[in-house]
A protein has these predicted regions:
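Active-site-adjacent substructure of cysteine-protease-like catalytic cores
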Residues: 301-366
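Extracytoplasmic soluble-region selector
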Residues: 2-181
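Residue-level detector of short, conserved catalytic/binding motifs and their immediate flanks
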Residues: 61, 161, 222, 341-343
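Noncatalytic regulatory segments and standalone regulatory/sensor domains
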Residues: 348-411
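Solvent-exposed, acidic/flexible segments
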Residues: 217-226, 275, 279, 301, ...
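Mid-length scaffold segments of soluble, non-membrane domains
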Residues: 270, 274-295
Length: 411
């Protein structure tokens, strides 16, 4: 304003940021008493003779005041309390601790056209709310996943993308995987971004593919456990990337079980009498092969549901067992198996369904057969806890084969 005196000193760092209705005292910003206050736009920010600033409306104004005869200039940014809008200078000047901004959604699985708003951790929520107008959201592949200024992501097509939220000098990432259930065939690869941004590839097998020399018949009858082990082992340990179920039998299974047990199941017994690896056996072999895991053998349904969903949200998989008997109704069905069956959970979708790797084709499923998208309850009704803590490496009933195995990324 032409009515303002000429300032001999311009102070712009830090800027004074206010929201409509706020009041501040200039003394606290300058550290000394002042006189002769002027505002370039009193409709935006007015100042009293005592140096009290009043934020009246959204916009910017300049305040000039005199301290010991020297005029100083301050810029005032006033934002709406419900929808803050901050300047580029403020974005650049905001300095926060390295871990100030974190999210509870490091990795997401979504289906095409689904939308979801990324959530901040409890330690970051207050900060994100306070500086909402400073948050910058970006997708590295907006043709796959779009993100708006509120952190709402929309899945557009199959693929993976990295969503970055930046606040001042810090940022956090969410890795989004847009998936379909179109995977089918004898063996197919499913790739995803993990919570660390690393690509992980699961090879999904059909157990009766008749593509496994020497073990075609065994795998067709009993191969669900071996296929599940091969899928997880190859995904979590690069030394075993792409390993076939037949190579698992002749490799890590033979290496980490006793010669007596391995020979009994693969040489001495008839095909009908041979047994698959137990969950205890799978867990043991994975640990011996450098893949960290936790075998949960007993649980209540409510505990397991919460635990399974929480683990899947980290982007890590779960190996589990189902049986013919429905634990809710007590009836026997052939929905998943006519005896016992091992499968792998790969993730939980933002719509609440789970992503399942299954080595058997299902007549009731209309999508691809290697990956299935189902309700978690559809699986949990057929899961069961261990009745004891048997250490049998091969199937020995509910004593060694109930529960589920949580897999962890190798650090």
């Amino acid at each position: 304003s032409s009515d303002l005196p000429e300032a001999s000193e311009i102070i712009t760092d830090p800027l004074i940021s206010m929201t409509v209705g706020d009041t501040k005292n200039l003394y606290f910003f300058h550290g000394d008493s002042a006189s002769a206050y002027f505002s370039s736009n009193p409709n935006i920010a007015s100042v009293t003779t005592g140096g009290v600033l009043n934020a009246n409306d959204v916009g910017s104004a300049e305040i000039i005041y005199s301290v010991h005869g020297v005029f100083h200039q301050r810029k005032i940014n006033v934002a709406d309390i419900e929808n803050p809008s901050f300047s580029t200078t403020q974005r650049e000047n905001l300095i926060l601790p390295d871990n100030a901004l974190t999210t509870t959604d490091p990795v997401l699985f979504m289906q095409k056209k689904d939308s979801y708003t990324i959530q901040f951790s409890s330690s970051s929520q207050a900060l994100a709310t306070r500086y909402k107008g400073l948050l910058i959201w970006k997708s590295d592949k907006p043709n796959i996943v779009r993100v708006d200024s509120n952190g709402k992501v929309t899945a557009l097509k199959k693929g993976s993308a990295t969503i970055t939220c930046t606040l001042g000098n810090v940022s956090c990432h969410t890795y989004v995987n847009v998936i379909t259930d179109s995977y089918t065939g004898k063996a197919t690869d499913f790739s995803m971004l993990t919570a660390t941004g690393k690509q992980r590839t699961y090879r999904l097998f059909k157990q009766n593919a008749h593509n496994y020399p020497r073990y075609d018949s065994y795998l067709a009858w009993h191969g669900c456990a071996t296929c599940s082990l091969a899928t997880v082992l190859g995904a979590y340990n690069d030394n075993y990337s792409g390993i076939l179920p037949s190579s698992v039998i002749d490799g890590v299974e033979k290496q980490f079980t006793s010669n007596k047990d391995w020979t009994r199941e693969h040489v001495n017994r008839s095909l009908r009498g041979q047994m698959p690896l137990s969950l205890y056996g799978i867990s043991s072999i994975l640990k011996s092969s450098g893949v960290d895991n936790n075998y949960v053998r007993t649980y209540t349904d409510s505990e397991a549901k919460h635990d399974i969903i929480s683990h899947l949200k980290t982007g890590n998989s779960i190996i589990f067992e189902v049986r013919q008997k429905n634990s809710r109704t007590g009836k026997r069905t052939k929905r998943w198996t006519n005896s016992y069956h091992t499968m792998v959970l790969l993730g939980v979708l933002t719509n609440g369904k789970v992503l399942l790797c299954d080595s058997v084709d299902r007549s009731w499923y209309n999508g691809g057969q290697r990956l299935k998208i189902v309700d978690l309850s559809d699986i949990m009704e057929y899961m069961f806890p261990c009745t004891s803590f048997s250490e049998s490496m091969y199937y020995n009933g509910a004593s060694s084969d109930g529960g589920y195995i949580k897999i962890y990324e190798i650090s």
